[in-house]
Regions:
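Ser/Thr-rich, Pro/Gly/Ala-heavy low-complexity intrinsically disordered linkers and tails
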Residues: 1, 10-30
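Extracellular/luminal regions of secreted and cell-surface proteins that mediate adhesion/ECM remodeling
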Residues: 23-263
Length: 263
């Protein structure tokens, strides 16, 4: 998700190349093969910055990300997760996952999405993790601090691979309670979360997780391994029997790290 507005109305995979609301021609889904996600380490290295963020009481940032009202010192960064595989990563319509029988009752949800009422759209769970790890004496890494971002809307934000046509995007509709969406990342494209998005940062002055000056490592993992709880889905098992939300041709290139100094 960069800053694209969602497409409205029911959207099927077969309709993506002809949907009249797109404002022009765009791509055709490529489902022959497997996706392969990486984290753009160069984008991470060039985008991180220190600053402040004022959080209003009752705002979506405060409610959804659990940040106390007031001005906070934050570490912002942009995350770009390109799909360099030979096929699309397709999630589809969130409503089909949370309400498969279309009765308005989410009790039969498959657990892949959670509804964010403040923003009135669905967040895809377990797409990525953002960690800030202190570098301890001897070079070991300490207990991670997690960024406040909790959910994701997968889309074709930017072309990534050379030669990719800027009009070849397929997936750009997050979906809401009343509009169908289609989430995914087309081969050769990247899903991008720019540093100015709400919650796209580490809170550095949280008294529960103090972040003193020193050396740290930012670690971004796309499609991370996880152990499911009672509300989670487990669509894919990797070679170590961990759950993944997306099937890929290669899970070994899903992490980017960056060592930084916090003054």
């Amino acid at each position: 998700m960069l800053l694209h507005a969602p497409l409205f109305g029911a959207i099927a995979l077969s309709a993506c190349s002809t949907d009249s609301t797109s404002g022009g021609d765009h791509g055709i889904p490529d489902l022959d093969g497997l996706a392969n996600f990486i984290v753009d380490s160069a984008r991470l290295a060039s985008s991180w910055t220190l600053g402040s963020d004022y959080v209003e009481a009752g705002s979506c940032t405060s409610i959804e990300y659990g940040i106390s009202p007031g001005t906070h010192r934050v570490l912002r960064f942009t995350v770009s997760t390109p799909n360099i595989g030979d096929a699309d990563a397709v999630v589809g319509d969130p409503l089909a996952h949370v309400d498969p029988n279309h009765d308005g009752d989410f009790s039969d949800s498959d657990g892949l999405f959670e509804y964010a009422p403040c923003h009135n759209h669905f967040h895809y769970k377990h797409y990525a993790t953002y960690e800030l790890l202190p570098v301890l004496a001897g070079g070991a890494l300490g207990t991670p601090i997690f960024a406040r971002k909790r959910g994701f809307c997968m889309d074709d934000s930017e072309p990534f691979l050379p030669g990719v046509n800027a009009n070849s995007w397929v997936y750009r509709a997050c979906g809401t309670l009343t509009t169908h969406g289609i989430q995914g990342v087309h081969t050769g494209w990247s899903d991008v979360y720019v540093r100015t998005l709400p919650g796209q940062y580490f809170v550095l002055d949280d008294p529960a997780q103090p972040t003193p000056p020193g050396e740290y490592v930012i670690r971004i993992t796309v499609n991370p391994p996880y152990l499911p709880d009672s509300t989670d889905a487990c669509p894919v098992r990797d070679e170590q029997n961990f759950c993944r939300v997306l099937r890929e041709s290669n899970y070994s290139d899903n992490v980017a790290t960056l060592r930084i100094t916090l003054p």
